[in-house]
Amino acid sequence: MDDILELAHILSPGTICGEGNVSGRDVNFKSNSFWIKASGTSLDTLKQDDLVACHLNAVPFNVKDKPSMEVLFHAWIYDNYDEVNFIAHTHPTNTNKILCSESCHEFANRRLFPDQVVRNGRKSCLVPYATPGRPLRDEIKKQIEYFVDEEGFFPKLILLENHGIITTGSSYKDCVASSLMCEKSAEIFVGARLLGQIQYLTEHQIMAVDKDPNEAYRRKIF
């Protein structure tokens, strides 16, 4: 639980009231349960009592507990992708500037600098806007499955149009690094656009970074 709380506290700056949610697999019952932020709680003040234990069907162990309304997509990801141990969903300001614009497809499919490739992958999965709750879970499922079929890997960064981002990882530090790198990339994207035409990495340059054994080692260390 401590890692989930640390994840929440690190990603809390800029959040208002109950914005965002975080979760992590239960280390004692890894195969069939996870802990998630309770509805109405805040990332910056999140404590152990604010976490709700849920089955992989999104039903809480204690029916009196009320998990985040986004529990459905957390449950679906854990149930279908064993490599994911932590999930963070936030609404970062610079990234949402892009996700609320026609530039969102460009931001998802192009890359600006090597560390963006390392932390956020060659491409990101872009999810069209859907109402939070079951409609959003269904759209996330549809787009992730399509992305995995097309790209051959699970997305490190999931972008939600007019909403926010989802990052996943084997450790909470993966989620932190991916979330912070996304926001840094968004700030650079907006700044570069203001200065003129953006100069992106080429596909060859992106693949060279992605396949570099030194970068693979850095990923493992981080």
Predicted segments, located by residue:
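Glycine-rich flexible loops
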Residues: 1-222
